[in-house]
Amino acid sequence: MNKIIGIAFFTVSFSVGATVSAAGQAAQIDPLGYTISTPHPIDPAAGTTNPSALATQRQNPYLGSVPSGKATDEVIALSLPQAIALGLRYNLGLIESNQSSADGRAQRLRALSALLPELSLEGRQGVADQSLKEFGLRLPSIAGFPGLPATSGSFGFQDSRISMTQSIYNSLLRNRYQAERKAEQASALSAADARDVVVYAVGASYLQVVAAVARVETARAQLASARELDQQTEDRVSAQLSPEIDSLRAQVQKHTVEQQVTNASNDLEKAKLTLARITGLPIDQKFTATDAAEYREVTGLTEKSAIGHAREFRADMRSAAASVREAEYRLRSEKGQRLPALSFRADYGGAGVNVGAFSQVYTVGGQVSLPLYTGGRIRADIDQAQSNLTRRQAEYEDLEGRIVYDVRVAWLDMQASDSSVKVAESNRALADRALTQSQDRYLNGVANYLEVLRAEEAVTEAAENYIRSLYSFNVAKMALARAMGSAESEIQDFFGGK
């Protein structure tokens, strides 16, 4: 359940970050430009550890990791598969899930031990002086005989035995063991589901880095264009072909784009830091993302087949089913308290005043116990187990609906983003053509600089729309792979072997 809450926090926090980022970009862009409405994907950079790193770690451990190794001066090349492999090894959320699975295994072994024979070796050595009156020993009165003494007198003894106890039939212990088996199975499946969450988290963060790289490259290309146009405008003003205000506008535009390059570079470095935190890379390690963002359609898959695949392979679904079975066995276990319990005990060894005078001794016995009155304790235990079973059944039924919801939402986002990518790519080409024509018109004295400035803003918006749409599309594919319950295997198919 904690893991589900962590996933929800992960998605919501990233979504808010992407919305704020998109809003900030829109404030700098002409609303009449080439704006395309696209679904807002998650933004890993929004998963900050401020103001409390510990609070964030507890709420969503998938944003953290156990750093591996030491940073080097070398700039390493990091591909998407390599980043995912690091995340699957060092991500904090997966480490915690694996440890929970180990805890479940320990609980099962503890429950099993109660059903197995227990052997122990016991030894005693002591000196005693027993009261004969305490045992009720007395002799009839005989004239001239003083009778038995009050105590036996001091004597030593030694006793050494090996003993065995075995539960022959105990409904509580048997069903408790079955419950722990199912709990271990549910924990292992939960750890398997955590792997999909890590793949999704690392993939989305990696794509954020790739998108940030594209924004930096776009901003640098726009800066080169702005500098060239600034020089051309300055030459036209010097030749008295354009008013001085055109040169001033060109300089303002150049400085604006320079700041955009700075901001884009800053966002790139923060995205890299976020990826390093999720994957376990040393925070000071420099790296470059080698896999560029590409548009690749998902083929051979329908929404219906994706839902069927999710119902069959989602590990959290199977974990929830195992939790229901666990709750059923726990209910049987509590009801078993009302049944007789049969156990066996035996011991064998030697006893005497010393080792040389040992005599063979042994004890064999059985025990049957049946509670007659417990003050309502058993009834309370049964009610609590029944309540837990009802809760687990409700969670399982809810998860069935949530799985369909996850797949359909991811599918809708992928379709919408797919359309956005195609429109954005077309608009980007049109905006580039419009800018070229505006520059030609300006240099030929047919148009003023404002037309060129508007065309540059349109190119900027079209480029940003394409980057955002492509990022949304790829993250939607990541979300679909995670929703289907096979993120590790589907990533290769969805991203062309990357």
Q: How would you describe each model-predicted region?
A:
Residues 96-111, 194, 198-217, 228, ...:
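Amphipathic alpha-helical coiled-coil segments
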Residues 87-88, 140-148, 242, 246-253, ...:
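Amphipathic alpha-helical coiled-coil scaffold segments and their short linker/junction regions
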Residues 76-79, 118-194, 309, 313-399, ...:
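Small/polar-residue-enriched beta-strand and adjacent coil segments characteristic
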Residues 3, 195-309, 413, 458-459:
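Periplasmic alpha-helical coiled-coil/stalk elements that build and connect Gram-negative outer-membrane
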Residues 80, 116, 199, 280, ...:
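ATP/adenylate-binding site constellation spanning eukaryotic-like Ser/Thr protein kinases
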Residues 2-13, 20-48, 129, 465-498:
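Acidic, low-complexity, intrinsically disordered peripheral segments
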Residues 23-124, 130-131, 289-324, 371-372, ...:
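Bacterial Sec-pathway N-terminal export signals of envelope proteins
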